Amino acid sequence: NNSNARRDLGVYVVEEPNPRAVPATRSLRFLPVEYPEQEFFPGRKWHFDSEALFVFEEKLYFLTKHRVTGETAAKAGTNLYRLDSNYTDRKNVLTLVGSRTDIVWPTAASVSPDGNSLAILTLDALWLFSKPRVGDDWLSGKLRQIPLPRDRTRQVEAVCWDDLITLRIANEQRDLFSFDLTMVDSPPRGDSKP
């Protein structure tokens, strides 16, 4: 939704394929979605684009990318939404859960295997949030930010956990990076919410 004008946003549900056995997969169903704050197409604020999704407690979450209105340029900020319904015959209105003003263009997100940490990938940093004490506003948890050397990592687009301390990051150029969180010098920050 780069221009924030699409009215046909949605999620394709597929079975998780075995990449070694299945060269292609099919959509099981399509879940149309809409952002509750978007009244105009394109929106007055260009805050209705998302490619960073994650699952927590069997719910799908979306992190938005904000753009300078009328342009494709990145703007700081992200909103966290939750998909609460699974309608196929009408739009599923997303629920706004939280927001931050300092995250620029989240491209991927993943919850740790134990469900206690969320990794959010942006073009120049890896943001690690602890599970919130109450509710599901992950953006309110304790934060640890790890800068990424963009000259090496380039256009990063995917993140996943190998285990509780190792993350894998892939970029658009098909390079794969492994991060051992115990080897990265970036102390956690306390609860802070810009």
Residue ranges and their predicted role:
Residues 1-194:
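Sequence/structural signature of beta-propeller domains
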